[in-house]
Each structure stands twice: as C-alpha cells, then as structure tokens.
Amino acid sequence: MKLKVFTKNDCPNCPPAKELAQKIENEGKIEVELFNTDEADGLAEAQFYAVLATPSLILCDKNEDEVEAWRGEVPTREEVYKKI
C-alpha cells in the first residue's frame, strides 16, 4: 500500500496532512509519497487522481489503484489504517 499526499505551498490546512504523512512513514507500514500541486510533477499526479482540493490523501494498492481517498480533508491516523 502507498499513501499519496497532495499539498500546495499556500494551503493553510496542509501542515497537519504533512505531519500525518511523516508519522505514518516513520511507522514503516505504508510507503508515503508527497506531492506539491504547485509543481508540474505534483500537478500531473493530482490530475491523474482527480485531486481538486488540498490537502488530499489517496491510499493506493500495489498497482497504484485508488483504495480510499480523502479529498480536501485530513483523516486521522486510525482512519488510514482501517483501510489497509
């Protein structure tokens, strides 16, 4: 499983999403990727997953298919782990 976290520079609600991503990554159970939608690569990935708001977190399986998504919100750590 992989958690993709989409943020942007001027997003006031993005710091909690980044903190959650860091905690989850440190636990080592899920791979975490951070994407900044102000950058070309981040924007392209956001378009692929239909991310229209930040922060957004997309949980993907090994084939990069979406399993669960939190668009425009930050889930709790427990909500993420329930979907694994």
Language-model region placement:
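Structural micro-motif
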Residues: Y49-I58
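N-terminal beta-loop-helix "entrance" segment that forms/cooperates
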Residues: A40-A50
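Thiol-based oxidoreductase modules, predominantly thioredoxin-like and allied folds used
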Residues: I30-G42
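Local sequence-structure signature of Cys/Sec-based thiol-disulfide redox active-site neighborhoods
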Residues: M1-N26
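Short alpha-helical
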Residues: P12, A40-D41, P75
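Alpha-helical elements of the RecA-like P-loop NTPase motor core of helicases
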Residues: P15, L43-A44, E68, E78
